[in-house]
Structures are given as structure tokens and as C-alpha cells.
UniProtKB/Swiss-Prot annotation:
InterPro entries: Rbsml_bL25/Gln-tRNA_synth_N, Ribosomal_bL25/Gln-tRNA_synth, Ribosomal_bL25_b-dom, Ribosomal_bL25_C, Ribosomal_bL25_long, Ribosomal_bL25_short, Ribosomal_L25_dom, Ribosomal_uL5_bac-type
SUPFAM superfamilies in the cross-refs: Ribosomal protein L25-like
Similarity field: Belongs to the bacterial ribosomal protein bL25 family. CTC subfamily.
UniProt KW keywords: Ribonucleoprotein, Ribosomal protein, RNA-binding, rRNA-binding
Record-level GO cellular component terms: cytosolic large ribosomal subunit
Family matches, as Pfam families: Ribosomal_L25p, Ribosomal_TL5_C
The name this protein goes by in its record: Large ribosomal subunit protein bL25
GO molecular function: 5S rRNA binding; structural constituent of ribosome
HAMAP family noted in UniProt: Ribosomal_bL25, Ribosomal_bL25_CTC
Reported function: This is one of the proteins that binds to the 5S RNA in the ribosome where it forms part of the central protuberance.
Oligomeric form and interacting partners: Part of the 50S ribosomal subunit; part of the 5S rRNA/L5/L18/L25 subcomplex. Contacts the 5S rRNA. Binds to the 5S rRNA independently of L5 and L18.
PANTHER family (UniProt xref): RIBOSOMAL PROTEIN L25/GLN-TRNA SYNTHETASE, ANTI-CODON-BINDING DOMAIN-CONTAINING PROTEIN (PTHR33284), RIBOSOMAL PROTEIN L25_GLN-TRNA SYNTHETASE, ANTI-CODON-BINDING DOMAIN-CONTAINING PROTEIN (PTHR33284:SF1)
Gene Ontology BP annotations: translation
């Protein structure tokens, strides 16, 4: 799914200018990278709210149009108001098709409904919900699936247990085996009947 953002350049900079933009229901932003000059931008708040409601907004290459000129970017930072439902600022990074990106991708834990361990009283404990990856822009996945259907009570899946898409590397695993982080585990519910606990122990 391609997400398109439309922005205009701005020359009125500083805290006062940003405050005025926010009062006008606009979002100040900046785009930088790819050996090009950083450019200050303005988005409409409603457009950003609509885009950020899509999970892929945070982990996909975005199509950015600035004053009619298009380029590709990824989201590097999004600042929210401390207590209001408002977005304060965006940082966007230009992508170079020939250079690898270091970014985060969400994990989707699938097939809980097929898990016998869960049916027998197991509880799923997720340790992490996203993973750092290194890949070319064309290979960047919107998410990575983790199938837990065959897990048994007491099992833990680590980063090394998932199959990454072609061209995608795990930043943590590249550091060595000691960085093979646990992602998800299944433990027996404390509310499970005593006979189920005994059955699991016997197995």
C-alpha cells in the first residue's frame, strides 16, 4: 500500500512560527538526508492524522510531494502533544534506492486461534512488538509475521526463529548471538484447572 503525503515548503522558522502553524491546524516538519539540503515543510494536520492511522505509515517508504515535486521518504520521528490529540512535528528522511535503511518494522503475531497451547490455558506474553531491520528501500516490509500456532506451553521464540523477507537483515542478530532477543513466549495461566497443570507436567 502506497501512502502519499503532500507538503509545502516554509521559510518562516522558529518556535513562534511553529506555534502559529499549529494554531492554524498545520504541522511543521523537516525532510533531510540523501546528501541534499534539509527543507522545512508544512502539512495539514488532518492529512497527517489520516495517514498516521495506517500502521504502514510508520514502517514504509512514503511518497512525499513538495510543491509538486515528488520524492521518497521514511518517517524518522513524530512528536505528539503531551495531553492533546495533536501532532506537533514530523522528521522525514529521504531514501536512496542504492543505500540500505536502518529502521523499525512492527511484528504481527498470527494464528493464535490455531494454537493448542492457548486452547489448553496458555497465555501469550509478547516481549517486543517491533524489530530493527536493515534493507534497501525496495525490500522494506510493512510488517513481519510471527506464526505462533505450533508453540507449546513453555516455549519462547527468539529473533533467530523468524524467517525474514528476502533482502532484510536483523540489526540485533548482526551484532551476534547474545543479541538474539526473545519475542514471544507462552506460559500456563495461573487460572488453569489443576488437572490441566498435571497433564502438562506429565507431558
Amino acid at each position: 500500500m502506497s501512502i502519499k503525503l503532500t507538503a509545502t515548503t516554509r521559510t518562516d522558522l522558529g518556535k513562534g512560527a511553529s506555534r502559529r502553524l499549529r494554531h492554524a491546524d498545520l504541522v511543521p516538519a523537516i525532510v533531510y538526508g540523501a546528501d541534499k539540503e534539509a527543507v522545512s515543510l508544512t502539512f495539514t494536520h488532518k492529512d497527517i492524522i489520516k495517514a498516521e492511522g495506517i500502521e504502514a505509515f510508520y514502517s514504509s517508504v512514503l511518497d512525499l510531494e513538495i510543491d509538486g515535486v515528488s520524492e521518497q521518504v521514511v518517517l524518522k520521528d513524530l512528536q505528539r502533544h503531551a495531553f492533546k490529540a495533536r501532532i506537533q512535528h514530523l522528521d522525514l528522511l529521504r531514501v536512496d534506492a542504492k543505500h540500505k535503511l536502518h529502521t523499525t518494522v512492527p511484528l504481527h503475531f498470527i494464528n493464535e486461534g490455531l494454537s493448542e497451547a492457548i486452547k489448553n490455558g496458555g497465555i501469550v506474553y509478547r516481549t517486543i512488538n517491533e524489530v530493527e531491520v536493515l534493507c534497501l528501500p525496495k525490500d522494506l516490509p510493512s510488517f513481519i509475521e510471527v506464526d505462533i500456532s505450533t508453540m507449546e506451553i513453555g516455549d519462547t521464540l527468539h529473533l533467530s526463529n523468524i524467517t525474514l523477507p528476502a533482502g532484510v537483515e536483523s540489526v540485533e542478530l548482526n551484532k551476534g548471538e547474545e543479541h538474539d532477543l526473545p519475542m514471544v513466549s507462552i506460559a500456563l495461566s495461573k487460572k488453569a484447572p489443576a488437572e490441566e497443570i498435571e497433564a502438562e507436567t506429565a507431558e
